[in-house]
Amino acid sequence: GALLAAGSNRPLTFGGTAEATVAPGATAWSDPVALPVLAQQDLAVSLYIPGQRVAPTQHTGAVVTSYRTADGSGDVAADESAGPFTGTVTSLWWLKSIEVQASASSSAIAAFGDSITDGTCTTLDAHDRWENLLSVRLGLEHDAAVRAGLGAGERWRAVLNEGIGGNTLTRDGLNPAP
């Protein structure tokens, strides 16, 4: 559900300020935030978009549940309870990625491909894309090597899902603006 772990909510800043205006087609990166995370851990990002209603940039086939407030709810981005977040969608709004700083003994595998890589036809909230399953398998192999005493040189490998859907490599997406 929408309930956050107590004490986990962190305010973000953009160039030291609490808000950012992002032009159409542009990207904004927040300043770094201290928040320890584990491999495979779900993260929540709460946003407040003031003023008039705007259409979000979104990943419509995200196959995960996102939570939203009713229009006119005000700024509840700091609320860790599930109370205000009464609506659900299965899209990811506004975000392209969340980057983490991994240990020096980590590495990553980037999975680039079509809608199968993106997660089409997987189960809502099950995290059963092939990249998720590969990540779990690599984690189990890493843990087994550490338990066997072979872990001194063993590297943790993250799997990055860079799948696309709807031919978004060569056009704006499934529902481009007219």
Each model region followed by its residue ranges:
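N-terminal secretory targeting modules
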Residues: 1-112, 117-125, 147, 151
